[in-house]
From Swiss-Prot:
GO biological process, alphabetically ordered: translation
Keyword rRNA-binding carried by entry: yes
GO MF annotations, alphabetized: rRNA binding; structural constituent of ribosome
Gene assigned in the entry: rplD
Family: Belongs to the universal ribosomal protein uL4 family.
Protein name: Large ribosomal subunit protein uL4
Amino acid sequence: MELKLLNANGQEGAGVSASDVVFGRDYNEALIHQVVVAYQANARSGNRAQKDREQVKHTTKKPWRQKGTGRARAGMSSSPLWRGGGRIFPNSPEENFSHKVNKKMHRAGLCSIFSQLAREGRISVVDELTLEAPKTKLLAEKFKAMGLDSVLVITDTVDENLYLASRNLAHVAVVEPRYADPLSLIYFKKILITKAAVAQIEELLS
């Protein structure tokens, strides 16, 4: 698979040869869906909680006698049928949202995503991406010259200047190959990878 090479001015150079094992796989929509859903589920923190009828603070006194009032039977005001009563199936912080995906499936899913992005021409390669100073303006000018507005930058080592400059840009993220997740790969319109990072990705996913 040939990936397009960009220079600092956004002009295309000679293509970069990449491994077909990582960048030349068939598109597997079901596998990609499974990997992305598992990633989103595992990112959930489980920080919501509701009370059941044992936890709400109510008296246990019977609201009215069982018979003779003409009203429906009622045992206590903490009943889920009553306003202010407990929930029948309350959400709990102890809920486990995690999904398990085997390592081979996870790697195959990432390879399928990279391959489809390469076929769509959404992956570009640069020799390196560094900044002289941690200035957002400098990075914004570079991306504008390359025609990039929504971009995930994958670099072999995250330069401090590059990281600081990218934090204030919307729709821009900078990660190392080992932290490239399936959701980010799909979310961003373009993927910009350094040459050294391409080799690292191939090593991680081969």
